Amino acid sequence: MEVVTTPHQTQEMAHALKDASGDLILMLTSSATSDLNDTAPKAVRAAGGNIERFGMPVDPGNLLFLGALTGKPVIGFPGCVRSPALNGADWVLSRIACGVTLDDHSFAEMAIGGLLKEIPTRPQPRRRSEG
């Protein structure tokens, strides 16, 4: 396993991605990736890769993106990946690590049961309304 740290800038990240070794690339960014034109997805494209999926119907984990670069999967992790609680990133990583190909149908299937247990510091919407 190789860990590379770069500034949160498209070109620096793209350069590191081009040089990445291994069979899988995992990206953890300094801020939430909220759209396809954010730094991390742009860096994947600048390195010659593509983004196959942005977002997923699982919370926590909905800000994940999945791409590919030179035949390697690239997973852009949302902030919830730092939590020990089960989240959508766990579902994606476990499938990719096992060689399962994910497509739009695969992600749609994750929507069933996609609201995972919330962490205490971020109550579920129904708890907020009980106030």
Feature annotation, model-predicted:
Residues R126-G131:
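Acidic, Ser/Thr-rich low-complexity intrinsically disordered segments
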Residues M1-P125:
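Short glycine/threonine-rich loop/turn motifs
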